Amino acid sequence: MAEITAAMVKELRESTGAGMMDCKNALSETNGDFDKAVQLLREKGLGKAAKKADRLAAEGLVSVKVSDDFTSATVSEINSETDFVAKNDQFIALTKDTTAHIQSNSLQSVEELHSSIINGVKFEEYLKSQIATIGENLVVRRFATLKAGANGVVNGYIHTNGRVGVVIAAACDSAEVASKSRDLLRQICMHIAAMRPSYLSYEDLDMTFVENEYKALVAELEKENEERRRLKDPNKPEHKIPQFASRKQLSDAILKEAEEKIKEELKAQGKPEKIWDNIIPGKMNSFIADNSQLDSKLTLMGQFYVMDDKKTVEQVIAEKEKEFGGKIKIVEFICFEVGEGLEKKTEDFAAEVAAQL
């Protein structure tokens, strides 16, 4: 059997949010296989929903630059050693100038950035001079630019503290609709900054991932139901266990079967057929909502809109399409958070874990 180290337990705990001993036991049961341990915890209802890694360590700022004609949007992350420097006016100016430089020169990589010329010198030398003046090591960690295609539009949003930045691109069927969609895209960027979707839509989800997440969802709901049965609180009824987790699983045949079942129920209730068309769409929407809980957690289009939580982002866009008189298709979004995926120095925590194993 593989040796289960404190560092392994720490990593699994930070990735899943499960308890320390639960993580140790999961690693033991899976012979130290990290991915299998994550899935085991999820199936036991002990791990949080799978998301992108969120261990934040580095300080710094995220910057966003949207071109005046809304055809190009750039987001960048520059790291500093301390939060104090991240609030420094010179550092803030550096992030803005660098982002504008990246966009205006259509740079594609950090290596290309360091070789580019800014203010008459190589960016690499320019950054060194900034490091010498500011007094901390500074690193351009990453950046990305979205371009609008024909009849397309981009926009962006930077959260007020500069730790989260979002850029987004949409394709429209006319320049007029693209122009009208600018504010909508900015509002959707604000939603993304708040809700952090991992995917654009259910179509981007892998079926194996969906099936595994369904098992975890059922385990989580059953665990909550067990607690609700124990408490016997009339204001907290048991969760209904869904048949599916995502629209990815809802084939035409499944949707047709659900519709036929609704018709049978309406017939049994004695509802006249002439009003069925007014009832069925709402019941089908409820069926889809009940069986796409994973989408509402992880996908932009499936999430409930932060500015109107009775509608999904997809529904809000559909309403705007009618208002603007044309199609609006979100093509891509990118969200950066300062330090995302970087790890703190946690020797003390590892020692704490080791002491309890």
From Swiss-Prot:
Cellular localization per UniProt: Cytoplasm
Domain of life: Bacteria
CDD domains reported in the protein's UniProt record: UBA_EF-Ts
InterPro entries on file: EF-Ts_dimer_sf (IPR036402), Transl_elong_EFTs/EF1B (IPR001816), Transl_elong_EFTs/EF1B_dimer (IPR014039), Transl_elong_Ts_CS (IPR018101), UBA-like_sf (IPR009060)
MF terms in GO: translation elongation factor activity
Cellular component per GO, a single term: cytoplasm
Gene3D superfamilies, A to Z: 1.10.286.20, DNA helicase RuvA subunit, C-terminal domain, Elongation factor Ts, dimerisation domain
SUPFAM superfamilies cross-referenced by the UniProt entry: Elongation factor Ts (EF-Ts), dimerisation domain, UBA-like
Major subcellular location class: cytoplasm
Physiological role: Associates with the EF-Tu.GDP complex and induces the exchange of GDP to GTP. It remains bound to the aminoacyl-tRNA.EF-Tu.GTP complex up to the GTP hydrolysis stage on the ribosome.
Family: Belongs to the EF-Ts family.
Protein's name in the database: Elongation factor Ts
Gene this protein is translated from: tsf
